[in-house]
Structure formats: C-alpha cells, structure tokens
C-alpha cells in the first residue's frame, strides 16, 4: 500500500497543484515535495527504496528543479520521456542478458519459468518505449492542461491495461508455488 501511495501521491499532488494551486510551477513544487516525503517514508518504514524509485525521484528532482529555476515547463514535461527511455533500456538489456530485472521486482508475488520473465522484460521495455513516444507527442502538440490530464487520466489507465494484458502470460507460465 505504501509503495502504491508513493507512486500515485506525487501525481495527485501535481494534478491538484496544477488545477487548484496556480499552474505548472506550483504543481512541480508540490510534486517535488510529495516525492521526497514519499521516498523518505518508504525508507523509514520499509528500510529500503527500490532502484526504480531512486532513479525516478532523481530524474524528478533534476527536471523539477530546472523547471522551477528556469520557469520553463519543458523540463518537467520531458521527465516522463527520460524515465520511460531509461526504464525501457533497463528492461530491454536485462532481457537480452537473460537476467530479467522485472523478475526481482515481481518474484515475491509471482514465480515464473525463466523464459517467461524474459518475454515479460521485452514486453515491458516495449511498453516504456511506447509511452516515451506518446509523452513526446502529447507535450509537444497540446496545452499544459491537456498534458497534465493525460498524465493522470491517460497514463494510469494505459499502464493498468498493460498490466492486465500480461495476466495470460503470468497465469499460463506461473510455477506451482506462485502466489497468484
């Protein structure tokens, strides 16, 4: 639950900051503060923070700080693209190397045949590369308001749909001692 809150909390803060707090600058500030609080809470409570969360928060702190200092919203808008490309490369390379990173993230929930982890790595890499392209299209061609709405009402449902589409692979290839 804490992990979910730490992922969604900053997005909610950004959305609220944009629509109720005066625009993209305030939204960025609220998201930065919320992200630091969330990652700190994860560390204090769980005594660990995932590598992906560290990467995500670092990119956010850099792009968000540049946005606040420069007043140019482009930097916060390219943050998702940068993250999606980084994550895409991580999942792609881990699949190529036959050492799927996604296995370490999910094996406490589901145990799969090794080749299924590799397939899932490639699919996840493709998803992140796709999301990078979509983010670039949206932020470059639409208003700040449309981009913010896309981040909340587009990215979250598309991610959920992607996860649901992976269920047949997971269910077909799970090992007997798997939790799902």
UniProtKB/Swiss-Prot annotation:
Parts of the chain that traverse the membrane: 25-45, 49-69, 76-96, 118-138, 150-170
The organism's place on the tree of life at top rank: Bacteria
GO cellular component: plasma membrane
Keyword field contains Transferase: no
Compartment(s) of residence: Cell inner membrane
Protein keywords: Cell inner membrane, Cell membrane, Membrane, Transmembrane, Transmembrane helix
Entry-linked InterPro entries: YciB (IPR006008)
Keyword Membrane: yes
Coiled-coil residues: none
Topology class, membrane: Multi-pass membrane protein
Annotated signal sequence range: none
Stated family: Belongs to the YciB family.
Protein's job: Plays a role in cell envelope biogenesis, maintenance of cell envelope integrity and membrane homeostasis.
Protein name stated in the entry: Inner membrane-spanning protein YciB
Organism: Rickettsia felis (strain ATCC VR-1525 / URRWXCal2) (Rickettsia azadi)
Primary gene name: yciB
